[in-house]
């Protein structure tokens, strides 16, 4: 039975309810971590990697901004894990859904903006009108700055959605081409299979990079408002 090219991006449901959270939480329910494995090498490498990334991100923040450290750690871990799980066969990637990414981007962006207006009201308002702006351009510049401010969460969500979706589509297309060429031209099929393997490796890197970029941009928005 032939499926639509975008069928793999449709949200699976059970009795009319989305099962995204069940898919994400199910492995942790089945395989609880024993106490003796809490400090193993894998966990140590994971902690070292997260600490190194957070140290780079939080160096630019003051004490007020560093209160968001736990939130940013949770964010980069969640997005990275979700992206990697979506590369497994017969799985669904929630971050290909714009609605989910907007659900992450808008609250984080709004929290950073509200923090700025609460603690640095004058500085936040000053962003709408840079110093030295000619008087005739003031109304238009304020409108442009306001629009650019409200576009930030949309840009965050669209960037993540587009990058993850594009990679999955390429894997789907090249994988289908490989299967079709196996009976026609085994040599060409071997070449496309090698390309598929390389693209899959690249997608693992993209999955982690996009999690880092999303969290880094949230961190920069926070820095502008604290």
Swiss-Prot record:
Task: Give this protein's Gene Ontology molecular function annotations.
Answer: proton channel activity; proton-transporting ATP synthase activity, rotational mechanism
Could you tell me the Gene Ontology terms of the biological process aspect for this record? proton motive force-driven ATP synthesis; proton motive force-driven mitochondrial ATP synthesis; proton transmembrane transport
| CDD domains linked | ATP-synt_Fo_a_6 (cd00310)
The record, for Pfam families, names: ATP-synt_A
> Where is this gene product found?
Mitochondrion inner membrane
Keywords per UniProt = ATP synthesis, CF(0), Hydrogen ion transport, Ion transport, Membrane, Mitochondrion, Mitochondrion inner membrane, Transmembrane, Transmembrane helix, Transport
Query: Subunit notes for this chain?
Result: Component of the ATP synthase complex composed at least of ATP5F1A/subunit alpha, ATP5F1B/subunit beta, ATP5MC1/subunit c (homooctomer), MT-ATP6/subunit a, MT-ATP8/subunit 8, ATP5ME/subunit e, ATP5MF/subunit f, ATP5MG/subunit g, ATP5MK/subunit k, ATP5MJ/subunit j, ATP5F1C/subunit gamma, ATP5F1D/subunit delta, ATP5F1E/subunit epsilon, ATP5PF/subunit F6, ATP5PB/subunit b, ATP5PD/subunit d, ATP5PO/subunit OSCP.
Q: What is this protein called?
A: ATP synthase F(0) complex subunit a
